[in-house]
Each structure stands twice: as C-alpha cells, then as structure tokens.
Regions:
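Intrinsic disorder/low-complexity signal
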Residues: 1-37, 512
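Class II aminoacyl-tRNA synthetase-like tRNA-binding/catalytic domains
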Residues: 2-6, 32-299, 466
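Hydrophobic alpha-helical scaffolding
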Residues: 53, 177, 248-251, 261, ...
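Short aromatic/basic micro-patch
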Residues: 131, 352, 479
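Ca2+-coordinating acidic residues in Ca2+-binding motifs
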Residues: 136, 357, 484
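Alpha-helical packing segments of well-folded alpha/beta enzyme cores
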Residues: 183-187, 304, 311
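Metal-assisted phosphate- and nucleotidyl-transfer catalytic regions
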Residues: 208-238, 310-430, 453-473, 511-513
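TRNA-recognition modules of translation machinery and tRNA-sensing kinases, especially anticodon-binding
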Residues: 245, 249, 254, 262-273, ...
Length: 513
C-alpha cells in the first residue's frame, strides 16, 4: 500500500470543465451546474480512463459498493458508484488525513451514501488507471448491513422483483436502466432526425385499437355501494351515469389517435404507456408497458418495413456505442454471445418472407422438430414458431408479411387476393415478435366492411372513419413494445426485469412487501 499523498495545491475540477455545453442555456455556471460534484462516468469513461485528470481535486457523490480496511485499519478502500456508469471508482482513505475516518467505517459497508473530496491519482493497482485519494468525506446516509436487503453479494432476479424499490442499486438492474435510457433517447433521436413529430396520445379512451376487448375500465362509480351502481334495464352497468358519460378504458394502443395527426402533419410518432388486461404470466407480457408507434403519410408497406428495420438497427447501434460497459456485463453474466448477436443484426439485412412461405418452412420443419402447436395456414404464430425461424432457420431477424386477415386488426389494408392483409411483423432472435405494423386501409367502404365483418361497434369509430371521409391518404405505421426492445439488446430473459416497476396480474411490484 503506497502512502496517500495529497498535494498542498491542486486545481479543483468541476462539472463545466467536463461538460461546458450544459451551461450555455443560462450562463449561470456557479449557480446551477457548478455543483462541485463530478460524475464517475465523466472521469473513468473518457478515452484515457481519467489519466488526464490526475492531480486534480474533485468531488464525487454516490453509494458504497464495498469498504475494506487495510494496513491494520490505517487505510480503507472505498469502492464508489453513482449510477452514471457500470464501472466503479476506488477511493482511498487515510485515517490520519480524513478527520471522520471512524464515522465513515461505522456508517456501514454496502449502500452508504457518501460525498468524497480528494485528489485523483494514477493507481498502482492493475485494472484501474486512477483512484481518488480522499481528503474530506461526508456521510450523507448510513446503511445498516444487518437490515439492508441488498447487503449480500448476489440475489435472484425473482427476489429483486419483491424489492423493486431497491433493485436499481444492483449491477444488473442498474445496467438495464442505463440501456433503457439509451433506447428511449435513441428512439427520439431517430424519429426527430427524420422529421417526425412527437404526439402525445390519450391514456383514457373509448377506442379498442386491437378489437380484443382486454382493456382496463376507468370509473368513479366504485366509490359507491355495489347496490347503488347505476344499471341498465338488462342488468349491465350504466356508464352514462359515470364520470365521462360512457364506458372509458385505459388505452391498449395510441395508434388510432396518432393516425389523426398523421393525416395532417405527415410523419408522426407516439411513445407512451399502454395497458392490457390479459391474465398472462408469461416472460413476454406485462399489464402496463410502453409502446412506440410511428405513422407515415404517403407511405406503403415497403416504406413501413424499411423504416422499422432502420429503427431497430439504429437503436442497437446506439446502445453498442454508448453502453459498452453495460453490454460487457450482460455478455458475461446474462447471455454469452450477446455482442455477436447484436453485431449480426447490424451487419445482416433482415430476411423477408410471406406468412404463407413461413408456414411452408415450419410445416416442413415439423417433420423432424416437435412444436407444441403444429403450424398450419391461418394459425396466429406463437413465440416458438417465431424464434425457430429467427434462431434455427435464418439466424437473424425476419420480416414476415401478408398475414391472413382473420388474425389481424380491422384497419389493415386488404391485399388483392381478399384473404390476406398488408401487414408485417419483425421477428428477432431471443424475443420473437418485436414489431407489428401494416399499411392502413385508406378506403372508407372497405374499412366499414371490415368493421362489420369483425362485429365491432361502428358508432364508436365514426371519428376514425372521418379520416377516410375527408382527405384520405395512404399511410402506414407500426408498433413496438419498448420493453421487448430492451430485452433484445440486453439479453434479459424476463420482461419484468426491464421496466422499473412491473405490473402483472395480482402484482404491483414495489407494494408487495
């Protein structure tokens, strides 16, 4: 152990030195951004791993990963993380130079919140170019190791779901959160750079975009006694007496609403929460999740497919560039081969095949491969079929088109055969369906006929039909489940582990304790 040497004078490094651009908007450097706290990311994630800052006085704030005493207790190594990066920064405390040395040691071992000021020096240890030699340490939050649920090193993901309010402090969920952030930022970047307008669509709605009926009801009448809830003569709840005067629900998709702006602003997208009242406990479904739904005017299915493929590749590339440390962790701990899989996505064109061609491939494969559900024309393919195509047959993403109209939504444009629609799904390894999209039916008479065939309520869709009555335009779009995208780029197996507070039947994560 080398002696902790602190120069008598050391230039203090503050945030604007690293990121001066954040101060341009207000010019209030000292008042706003000069907080005398540097993100660990801005030190060790630089090209030289922080060596250019050696000799600078800096202040960091974060939480302890470990505290280890050395030299008979004269020194202590404090491993700090502030969530800005996967990597930690080691800080060295000298009992003779940190006045509250014993207080720091008594504060706990894991999860203690500290603010540490010191000089950055070149580290003598292998694997860490720099370390921080502390001069001042402030204990902001103690953490009793006997009570802290994350005190031990490793926890199962199932256990972490029971303490969702604390699990962001773990390596795995922290890395997921950073990748999720990058995917969200990349989403806006992709569409904004291409001239799309971001539209906020409603969460409370009366429209069922999918026609599935698996929607949550929004009502204020449950505050009353059951016997006092208004009912119609046939015994059903009388929603005309409810808050909105009709049966209001939580949206399953923002697509129909965002189409209204597509027919005025051309290229638009929505990115927000959606809700499904499906009694599903699978690793691919949630009751509350986020959807990205672009709509493009003057666009056919070919345009739709091209934009969707570009979007997937753009997000994948962005994460690989900006979250290399997190992906290295996932490669080591979650999915060996993850990086090769993602590189293959970037370097290979997606396979294009029709639904009918896919059924033929699966039917032939069924002669030697056992599927839980045997493939046949008209089957709504499951994840076992989708993953077989992407992982076993083509070994890359697949864009499947021209589905039977019976298994797709009413708004999808009919092909000339009258049996299939101009729909497309993007299937990817590990996940199966990642994106679902279509060219929308722009002809009023055809759309009305489809609504009737599917026994849907035309009266609740009159506003949607107005888009075809007044200046109809050919347009296309797609929807992507954001959590599935995060699963795809991280290798995480369960969708409940890629959203901060997962909701599924009989569960509300952070409220389970």
């Amino acid at each position: 152990m080398t002696e902790v040497v602190v120069p008598e004078t050391a230039e203090e490094l503050t945030l604007p030195t690293v990121h001066p651009e954040v101060c341009k908007a207000t010019n209030k450097v000292d008042d706003v951004w000069k907080r005398r706290r540097i993100l660990i990311r801005d030190i060790i994630c630089t090209p030289d791993k922080g060596l250019s800052f050696v000799g600078k006085m800096i202040t960091i704030g974060g939480w302890t990963r470990t505290i280890r005493k050395q030299g008979g207790g004269k020194f202590a190594f404090v491993v700090m993380n502030d969530g800005s990066t996967f990597d930690n920064l080691q800080c060295v405390m000298d009992s003779e130079k940190v006045s509250n040395y014993e207080e720091v040691l008594k504060a706990g071992n894991v999860g203690v919140c500290l603010q540490i000021k010191g000089v950055l020096v070149k580290s003598p240890a292998a694997g860490q170019p720099v370390e921080l030699h502390a001069t001042e340490v402030v204990v902001l939050g103690t953490c009793d190791p006997a009570k802290f649920p994350l005190a031990k090193k490793r926890h199962t993901l199932e256990h972490l779901r029971d303490i969702a309010h604390l699990r962001a402090r773990t390596n795995t969920i922290g890395a997921v959160a950073r990748v999720r952030n990058s995917c969200a930022f990349a989403t806006h970047l992709f569409f904004q750079e291409r001239g799309f307008k971001y539209i906020h669509t409603p969460i409370i709605t009366t429209a069922d975009c999918e026609g599935a009926g698996e929607m949550f009801t929004v009502t204020t009448m449950l505050d009353e006694k059951v016997k006092d809830i208004p009912a119609t003569p046939d015994g059903k709840i009388d929603y005309t007496k409810d808050f909105f005067g009709k049966h209001a629900k939580m949206t399953v998709s923002g697509q129909l609403n965002v189409e209204t702006y597509c027919c005025a602003l051309c290229d638009v997208y929505t990115f927000g929460p959606t809700f499904r009242a499906e009694n599903s406990h699978s690793v691919r479904h949630l009751s509350e999740f986020w959807m990205i739904e672009p709509e493009m005017a003057f666009a056919d299915l070919d345009v739709d497919m091209a934009v969707a493929e570009d979007y997937v590749k753009f997000c994948t590339s962005y994460v690989m560039e900006h979250n290399a440390d997190d992906l290295a962790f996932f490669e080591k701990q979650i999915e060996p081969g993850l990086l090769d899989r993602l590189k293959n996505v970037l370097e290979s064109p997606f396979v294009h095949l029709t639904y009918t061609e896919a059924i033929n491939v699966l039917t032939e494969a069924a002669k030697t491969h056992k599927f839980e559900v045997q493939p046949y024309w008209g089957l709504d393919l499951g994840s076992e079929h989708e993953r077989f195509l992407t992982e076993q047959v083509y070994k890359r993403p697949v864009i499947m088109t021209d589905y039977p109209k019976e298994i797709k939504a009413f708004y999808m444009k009919l092909n000339e055969d009258g049996k299939t629609v101009r729909a497309m799904d993007i299937l990817v390894p590990k996940i199966g369906e990642l994106i679902g999209g279509s060219q929308r039916e722009e002809h009023l008479d055809v759309l009305e006929r489809r609504i009737e065939e599917m026994h849907m309520s035309k009266s609740t869709l009159e506003w949607y039909l107005d888009l075809r009555r007044y200046g109809t335009v050919p347009h296309s779009g797609f929807g992507l489940g954001f959590e599935r995208l995060v699963m795809f780029v991280t290798g995480m197996e369960n969708i409940r582990d890629v959203i901060p507070f997962p909701r599924w039947p009989k569960n509300r994560s952070e409220e389970r304790r």
